[in-house]
A protein has these predicted regions:
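A short, N-terminal "cap"/entry segment at the start of jelly-roll beta-barrel domains
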Residues: 1-33, 46, 119-141
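A generic "binding-loop/recognition-motif" signal
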Residues: 19, 43, 52-53, 71, ...
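Short histidine-centered beta-strand/loop micro-motifs
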Residues: 24-26, 46-51, 68, 75-77, ...
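Conserved hydrophobic/aromatic beta-strand scaffold that supports enzyme active sites
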Residues: 34-38, 56, 75, 83-85, ...
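Conserved short histidine dyad/triad with adjacent acidic residue
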Residues: 35-51
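Histidine-centered metal-chelating micro-motifs
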Residues: 44-46, 65, 84, 88-94
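Ligand-binding loop in jelly-roll beta-barrel domains
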Residues: 79-80, 88-114
């Protein structure tokens, strides 16, 4: 069983809107996964929701804004040292608004246990790519 996951030994997934650096695959845990999200200035993932996931972000560097709800309510700025919690079922996105990359460590927690339909990080990324019309092979490079 693995207990330590070095953040300098990640697998990079470059989506058209941001990059995720996989630190700990959900397959290696009972009910969680972890990755570092990186967005360049002006980038933002699309507004999205996780029905089975609570997300916790710790901002490492850069500046962003927390947007929540289907009506895109601005919850204000986030920056280094801030901890953000996104409850299950909450629509959200975090655009990078500064002039440097926004980097934050994400811990996804699955209150009901690891999702059986997407038991690995890669299976989840394939679903995300399909839902957004992105090429999985291009994302995983």
């Amino acid at each position: 069983m693995k207990y330590v996951f070095p953040t300098d030994q990640t697998t990079r997934y470059r989506f058209p809107t941001h990059a995720n650096l996989l630190v700990m695959d959900r397959a290696e845990a009972t009910a969680s996964e972890s990755f570092i999200t990186v967005m360049e200035p002006g980038e933002a993932p699309p507004l999205h929701v996780h029905h089975d996931t609570e997300q916790v972000f710790f901002v490492l560097s850069g500046q962003g804004r927390l947007i929540t709800g289907a009506d895109e309510q601005d919850q204000g700025p986030i920056g280094p040292g801030d901890l953000v919690r996104i409850p299950p079922g909450t629509w959200h996105k975090v655009p990078c608004v500064g002039d440097e990359a926004l980097r934050y460590l994400v811990v996804d927690v699955f209150p009901g246990g690891r999702p059986t339909a997407e038991p690995t990080w890669e299976s989840h990324v394939r679903v995300v790519c399909e839902g957004n019309g992105w090429d999985f092979d291009a994302v995983k490079r």
